[in-house]
C-alpha cells in the first residue's frame, strides 16, 4: 500500500497554467506594469520640471538684459537732448553764424548713430537666432510648436540676405528705431498744437488770403511738379536698369506730397531773434502751419487713389475726382472736429468752477487738447489738421476762461513739449541715417529729387506771388519772394510722413532721399539764413508793435477798409454771439439774441458778462471798427471817434483820433467802449505797449 502512495505524479506546466490560476495572476501583472510606468513617469517629470526651471531662468535673464538695453537706449536720447540744450545755451552767448542748434542736434544724432552702427556689436549669445525656418509667406503672427509648447512670434520686418550674419547687431539697431506711430501719436501733436495755440492772429488774418494761396494752391503745385519730375527720373532709371523694384506714378506723387511739407523752424527761429519784418514772418509762419496740414491730407488722398480695374496705378478720371473729394472731406472733417473739441473745452471751463483748482483745470485742458488728435485719427480724419485748429480755437476762447495761473501753465507746458519734441526729432533724424535697416540710395533719384524740390518751390512762390500782388495793397516784394523761396526747408513733418510706411522698395527709397533732403536744407539753407537776409536787404530789428508808425495814413485806412470788407460779418458774429456763449465776456446774449430766446440766453450768459468783471483777453486779435460811437480809454483820458461823415474830427496829440486809434490798435492792451460794452483787446502779449500818454496798462498781457 505504501509503494502505491509514492506514485510518481506527472510533470505540470506551471502554477498559472490553469485558467483559474491565470485569472488570479492577471491583476498582479497589471499592478506591476502600473508601478513601472509610474516610476518612469516620475523620472521623466522630474527632468521636465528641471528643463522648465532652466527655461524660466533663461527667460528672466533675457528679460532683464532687454530691460537694461532699453534703458540704455532711452538714456542715449536723453543725453542727446541734454547736449542739445547745453548747445543752445552756448549759442545764446556766442552765436555761430552759419550753424543753428537744430542742425547741430542732427550732427549729434549722426555721431551717435555712427557709433551704434559700427562701434558696438552685440555678443552672439545674447540673442538665440535660428535661420532654418522657412515659410512661403510673411504672416504678421507666427505660432511655433517647440516640444509641444506653442510660442508666438511677431513680424518685425524684412532683413536683406547680406545681413543674415549680423542679425544680433540688427536687433540692437532695431531697438533704437522707434515705431513710426510714436511720431504721429506722441511727438507731432504738441508741435502742431503749439503752432496754433501761439499763433499771432493779427498778422495771420491780415495776410490770410496770401497764406491760404501758398498753403493750398502752392502745396498742390509743388506736389505735381515734383511728382512729374520724379516720374521722369524713375523712367530713366528703368531704362538704365537702376530700378530694382516697382515705382509707379502714384508713388512719385506721394513723394511730391511728402517733400512739399515745409518746416522752416530754423529760419523762423532766426527771424524771431533778429526781429525780421513781421509781414515776411507772418507769410512764412502761416504757410508752414497750414502747409503741413495740407501735405498730410494730400498724401492720404494719393494713397486712397484706387482706379477701377485690375491695374491700380493707371490714370482714371473717376478715381481722381474721388481722391479730390476725399481730400476735401478729410480736411473739412478734421477742421470741424478740432474746432468742436475746442468749443467743448471752452464750455466746460466756462460752466464749471475748475478755475478754483488750477491743477485740475490744466490737466483737463491738456487731455482735451491731446485727445483731439487721437479722436480725429480714430474717426479716419487727420489729427494734424484737427489739433491745429483745436489750438487756434483754444487760444481764442478757452484761454479766456482759464485762471491766470492756468494760462501761464498751459502756455509753458506746450512750449516745453514743443521744444523737446522738435529737438528730439532732429536728433533722431541723424540717428536714423545709420540705424535704419533698409536704406535705398540711388544717385539718379537723389539728384532728381533735389532738382525737383527747387523747381517745385519756385513754381509755388513766384507765380502765386505775381497773382497775389495784383490784388494786394501791400505788395510782396521780390526780396520777400526770394527769401520765401530760400526758406523752404524740410523738417519734422516730411520726415514723419516718409518714415510712416517703409514696407516697399519705393517707400524705402523715398524715405532715404527725404532724409538727405532734410539734412541739406537744414544745414545749408538754415545756416545761410542770416547771410541771405543781408544779401536781400530785408529789414531786421523791427518791433511788431511799431510796424504801423511808418505806414502812410491812406494805406492804413485802405487796409482797415479791406479788413472790414473781408471780416466784418465774422467779427460781428464772433463778438455778439460766440464769445458771449463760450467765454465770460462780450455783450450778454439777452441783448443780442431775439426775445423768444430769452430763457436760453439767460441760461448761457455768464454772470460776469452782466457785471463786466471778466474782460475778454484775446491776444493778437484784430478788431474791425465800424462807424458809430467808439471811445478809446487811456487811463483817465478818452478819445472819441466820429462817424465817417463827420466834418470836424477831433485832434489828439497832433493827429486825428482815427490815427491815434489805429496806432493803439496795433499795440498793447486798451479798453474799448462800443455802445456801452467794455472790451479789453490785448494785441500782443509778448511785448509791452507803447506808453504814448505816460499811462499804465489796464489789463495783464
Swiss-Prot record:
This is Sodium/hydrogen exchanger 6. One of its GO terms (cellular component) is recycling endosome membrane. Endosomal Na(+), K(+)/H(+) antiporter. Mediates the electroneutral exchange of endosomal luminal H(+) for a cytosolic Na(+) or K(+). By facilitating proton efflux, SLC9A6 counteracts the acidity generated by vacuolar (V)-ATPase, thereby limiting luminal acidification. Responsible for alkalizing and maintaining the endosomal pH, and consequently in, e.g., endosome maturation and trafficking of recycling endosomal cargo. Plays a critical role during neurodevelopment by regulating synaptic development and plasticity. Changing residue 383 to D: In MRXSCH; reduces oligosaccharide maturation; decreases protein stability; partially accumulated in the ER; impairs acidification of endosomes; reduces localization to recycling endosomes; impairs trafficking to plasma membrane; reduces uptake of recycling endosomal cargo. GO terms for biological process: axon extension; dendrite extension; establishment of cell polarity; monoatomic ion transport; neuron projection morphogenesis; potassium ion transmembrane transport; regulation of intracellular pH; sodium ion import across plasma membrane. It comes from Homo sapiens. It comes from the Eukaryota. Changing residue 568 to Q: Does not affect post-translational maturation; does not affect membrane sorting, does not affect pH homeostasis in recycling endosomes, does not affect cargo trafficking. Glycans are attached at residue 128.
